[in-house]
Amino acid sequence: MFTFIRSNLNNLKAYTPHSAGSSEILLDRLDTNECPYDLPDNLKQKLAENYQQLIETNRYPDGSHLKLKEAIAKYVNEVTPSANISANNISVGNGSDELIRSLLIVTCVGGEGSILTATPTFSMYSILAQTLGIPVVNVGRKESNFEIDITAAEDAINHTKNPSIKAIFVVHPNSPTANALNSQELVWLRSLPDDILVVIDEAYFEFSQTSLAEELNQHPNWVILRTFSKAFRLASLRVGYAIAHPEIIINLEKVRLPYNLPSFSQAAAQLVLNHSQHLLSFIPEILRERSKLFATFGEIPALKVWKSAANFLYMRLTDEGLKLMGKSSQDQSLSSLMQRLKTQGTLIRHTGGGLRITIGTSEENQRTVERIKGIF
């Protein structure tokens, strides 16, 4: 209809999260890998006091994010003492999505480069690249353990021209498949030349407790992304951060929007960092629940479930499961299963050729088990 809209947006599909809609039943929201617990009341009260006493809503937020950057650097060094990070190594975004977009602008926009991803993986890398007109090269993963097809990746790097691959995006652990980078993948990442940006998304670090932050000094072309949306319970406030060489940070700061992070979001992020030990104390419970769910789903012949290093599980249907669903394909069967669970009150995500189920509270997980067993 409008000829001024870029033609290459016609085939682009926007990221579409579930909508709770007007459902009258209790919904167990296990589709977006959030923490199942809200902030404690005492911290919410403290945030309310900060909002009332310290934040002037008629003033723009702190555009330098300096206090928040210093708090983030302190946290990174506490959990990874050998990282030796300072505020100069930190850039803050309105969620990690903004930082992904900024990294794409810094490296690839204007025909300067392509990006490489290994699917299935987090879809926003490709979506954001396409919105910027950046070519995306996808390689596969091994079906057994979802390890990156390194041979295919190397071939893509060597043969992709005009533009060549300038950035590689990996998640550690991967979403939706929940596997952490293994030794072969790490050897490959360490071997990549300095003229390729390596983006390691550690959104689920607090659950996996595996990080590459201590290697940043040896690999100045690496960037680590993290978020406050998962373990720190601030999904509604959209705070993410990048850890990288100061020169990369300087360029990220050049392309980000001014005043990109509201004062309330900055205050909340600083508050949760000051109470990180208490807030993260729920993680052992999530890991126990994950182990229970993995064992339970593994006993259902209709399901194939993979081990997880994150706060979610990934599964597909076996041949028996496909037969029970009465569909001709994995995709159709998974869509049908997802919809049946939704009508019963459990939201999960159908993505990457499988189903991704967030680990919820014990009660939510029990309801999910009962509903899945009721179907099979």
UniProtKB/Swiss-Prot annotation:
One of its GO terms (molecular function) is pyridoxal phosphate binding. The keyword Transferase applies. It catalyses: L-histidinol phosphate + 2-oxoglutarate = 3-(imidazol-4-yl)-2-oxopropyl phosphate + L-glutamate. The keyword Translocase does not apply. Gene3D superfamilies: Aspartate Aminotransferase, domain 1, Type I PLP-dependent aspartate aminotransferase-like (Major domain). Its cofactor is pyridoxal 5'-phosphate. Pathway: Amino-acid biosynthesis; L-histidine biosynthesis; L-histidine from 5-phospho-alpha-D-ribose 1-diphosphate: step 7/9. The modification N6-(pyridoxal phosphate)lysine is found at K230. Keywords: Amino-acid biosynthesis, Aminotransferase, Histidine biosynthesis, Pyridoxal phosphate, Transferase. Belongs to the class-II pyridoxal-phosphate-dependent aminotransferase family. Histidinol-phosphate aminotransferase subfamily. This is Histidinol-phosphate aminotransferase.
